[in-house]
């Protein structure tokens, strides 16, 4: 029998018969590993324990201790178990697809009746019965004709269509347990009992079109979440409850920050309070960029298609652009313009004005650029996903040798900004060269090394995402962690030698010859709209004092105190504090409660005692106790708190 060589993570290699399965490999190492094994990685591919290995390969055996692989298998198996449970409860239901998604899975079903909350409970119960039965999960390769005949016989048109879409020279892999079969690439666990029965929950039902096309039949999508332990599930459900309380759409109404409406889908109507947050954040970012050596510019929002064709965006991005046709005098054809979906081609136009020398580099151009992208109506979500937004966008034009230092400076700036805004931890992911790419391996080596050196220079941790860079260069993605543990991808740093070439950007080098600069696309917030949504949810509306739209409300207890209230408000405003008076004929407790709902950080209550002592009674948001302070003292303190960081 032919032999193959399998190399393990420790670098040691062993000979095995060709066709051996990972399950057999695990058992050959130790009885314990044979029992604990759930899957393998073979040459980087996630591999079922039942699949044969025919050639030399690198292999790693996975157990439940391997978080990523374990969760993928648990969630994938639950998709199958749920689909089986649904068809056992309602045999007429047709099945389609059921992939793993973030935190869980979904499966799409064709059913005439709508799934109810009671139905979800019945499905969960049947799923737990299947899990507790510890039924073996088996797999087999079928010929295409056999798979089509199998699904046609059972009246499963969606599965027939899926099989027919698979190339004719490929075999069809089937998985089954308890007599229920599904078309699937795998891998899966070895028996249903390996799925934790107390660590999953069916969450919701939503509509979904077959293959995502609104021209096709509408299906019902059941979502589920799953984890390795019951405690992890409880923690996740608690996080969802907390997230619901912090929902920026709900708080946006309570704090009178913004609204959206059908006449302008995906476009934000900022109210005075929300616009104040926006402007304060913009002023903060403008100051930080100025300190870091950026020059602010402004470019047009409506640009002729010729520029988008030259940049390559027209071909690749046209479907997501807002097109504007204009009839101009004496023109034979209509002029076709587009609202810019990104700022980079316009920034190259600014760079191209006037001859540049190597002495002018690095040149850092920043813009709070207004962009528009056509997002599908189903994908829009409050401030988090909109069609009209403003980026804290900047592009650095530099030489290859300057990439490392510019990247390091950017990471330090980003880290400082996030810290000022209340985010002390973030993750960095380095996406490296894809298979299809431009440029030489030597050029990619230099740039990827420059980014890694920059990250190490600032002492940050990072992970590599192999093959996920753009076709023209590697990139860094920055994910911050909020107060309830959610991760948000906001910052980016993208190396681009392509756009300067397409749009003719040049500089004169030390050798007197013309060279192409590198263009570094970078953002810290991403978009103001989305980042403000993140801030609102991170702080549950209780924004830092300097960022709060209404920083202080000075409330009278009796009408005789109104003149002193006006004096206090004037003193605070003179020192840059956003202060308002509340002299309505309402009880002080009512005023305090109302302004607390509006998330005002400080309420100063004033009665005759405070008038006579020229003091104020200070109540801070979230606290029940009050503190008496002299007028000059409270003005000095609040003026200091109101200063924008940096």
Swiss-Prot record:
It holds the Pfam family HGTP_anticodon. It catalyses: tRNA(Thr) + L-threonine + ATP = L-threonyl-tRNA(Thr) + AMP + diphosphate + H(+). InterPro entries: aa-tRNA-synt_IIb (IPR002314), aa-tRNA-synth_II (IPR006195), aa-tRNA-synth_II/BPL/LPL (IPR045864), Anticodon-bd (IPR004154), Anticodon-bd_dom_sf (IPR036621), Beta-grasp_dom_sf (IPR012675), TGS (IPR004095), TGS-like (IPR012676). It is found in: Cytoplasm. Zn(2+) binds at residues 344, 395, 521. Its cofactor is Zn(2+). One of its GO terms (cellular component) is cytoplasm. GO terms for molecular function: ATP binding; metal ion binding; threonine-tRNA ligase activity; tRNA binding. Keywords: Aminoacyl-tRNA synthetase, ATP-binding, Cytoplasm, Ligase, Metal-binding, Nucleotide-binding, Protein biosynthesis, RNA-binding, tRNA-binding, Zinc. SMART domains: tRNA_SAD (SM00863). The keyword tRNA-binding applies. One of its GO terms (biological process) is threonyl-tRNA aminoacylation. SUPFAM superfamilies: Class II aaRS ABD-related (SSF52954), Class II aaRS and biotin synthetases (SSF55681), TGS-like (SSF81271), ThrRS/AlaRS common domain (SSF55186). Residues 1-63 form the TGS domain. Belongs to the class-II aminoacyl-tRNA synthetase family. Homodimer. NCBIfam families: thrS. This is Threonine--tRNA ligase. It comes from Cereibacter sphaeroides (strain KD131 / KCTC 12085) (Rhodobacter sphaeroides). The gene is thrS.
């Amino acid at each position: 029998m032919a032999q193959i060589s399998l190399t393990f993570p420790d670098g040691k290699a062993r000979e095995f018969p060709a066709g051996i399965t990972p399950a057999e490999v695990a058992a050959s190492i130790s009885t314990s590993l044979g029992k604990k094994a759930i899957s393998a990685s073979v040459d980087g591919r996630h591999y079922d324990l039942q699949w044969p290995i025919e050639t030399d390969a690198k292999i790693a055996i996975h157990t439940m201790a391997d978080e990523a692989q374990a969760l993928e298998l648990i969630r994938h198996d639950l998709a199958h178990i749920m689909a089986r449970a649904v068809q056992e409860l309602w045999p007429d239901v047709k099945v389609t697809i059921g992939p793993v998604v973030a935190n869980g899975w979904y499966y799409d079903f064709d059913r005439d009746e709508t799934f109810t909350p009671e139905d979800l409970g019945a499905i969960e119960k049947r799923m737990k019965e299947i899990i507790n039965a510890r039924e073996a999960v088996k797999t087999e390769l079928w010929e295409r004709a056999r798979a089509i005949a199998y699904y046609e016989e059972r009246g499963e048109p969606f599965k027939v269509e899926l099989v027919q879409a698979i190339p004719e020279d490929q075999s069809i892999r089937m998985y089954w347990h308890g007599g229920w079969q599904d078309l699937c690439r795998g891998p899966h666990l070895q028996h249903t009992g390996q799925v934790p029965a107390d660590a999953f929950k069916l969450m919701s039902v939503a509509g979904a079109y077959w293959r995502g096309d609104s021209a096709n039949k509408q299906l019902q999508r059941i979502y589920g979440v799953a984890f390795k332990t019951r405690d992890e599930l409880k923690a996740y459900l608690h996080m969802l409850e907390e997230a619901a309380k912090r929902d920026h759409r709900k708080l946006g109404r309570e704090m009178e920050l913004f609204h959206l409406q059908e006449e302008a889908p995906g476009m934000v109507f900022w109210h005075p309070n929300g616009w104040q947050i926006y402007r304060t954040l913009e002023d903060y970012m403008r100051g930080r960029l100025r300190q870091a050596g950026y020059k602010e510019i402004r470019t047009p929002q409506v640009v002729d298609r010729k520029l988008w064709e030259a940049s390559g965006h027209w071909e690749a991005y046209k479907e997501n652009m807002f097109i504007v046709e204009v009839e101009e005098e004496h023109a034979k054809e209509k002029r076709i313009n587009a609202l810019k979906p990104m700022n980079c081609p316009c920034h190259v136009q600014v760079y191209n004005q006037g001859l540049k020398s190597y002495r002018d580099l690095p040149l850092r151009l920043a813009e709070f650029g207004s962009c528009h992208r056509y997002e599908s109506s189903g994908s829009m979500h409050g401030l988090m996903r909109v069609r009209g937004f403003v980026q804290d966008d900047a592009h650095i034009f530099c030489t290859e040798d300057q990439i490392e230092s510019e990247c390091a400076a950017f990471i330090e700036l980003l880290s400082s900004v996030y810290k000022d805004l209340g985010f002390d931890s973030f993750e960095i992911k380095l996406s490296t060269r894809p298979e299809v790419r431009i440029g030489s391996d030597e050029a990619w080596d230099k740039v990827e090394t420059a980014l890694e050196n920059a990250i190490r220079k600032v002492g940050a941790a990072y992970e590599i995402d192999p093959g996920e860079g753009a076709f023209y260069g590697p990139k860094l993605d920055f994910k911050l962690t909020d107060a309830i543990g959610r991760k948000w991808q906001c910052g980016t740093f993208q190396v681009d030698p392509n756009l300067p070439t397409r749009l003719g950007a040049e500089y004169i080098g030390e050798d007197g010859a013309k060279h192409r600069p590198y263009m570094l696309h970078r953002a810290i917030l991403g978009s103001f709209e989305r980042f403000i949504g993140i801030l609102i949810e991170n702080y549950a509306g209780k924004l830092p004092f300097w960022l709060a739209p209404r920083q202080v409300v000075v409330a009278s207890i009796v009408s005789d105190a109104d003149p002193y209230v006006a004096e206090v408000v004037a003193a605070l405003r003179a020192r840059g504090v956003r202060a308002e008076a509340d002299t309505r004929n309402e009880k002080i407790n009512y005023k305090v409660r109302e302004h607390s709902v509006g998330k005002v950080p400080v309420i100063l209550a004033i009665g005759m005692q405070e008038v006579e002592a020229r003091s104020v009674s200070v109540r801070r948001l979230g606290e029940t106790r009050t503190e008496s302070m002299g007028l000059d003292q409270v003005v000095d303190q609040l003026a200091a708190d109101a200063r924008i960081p940096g």
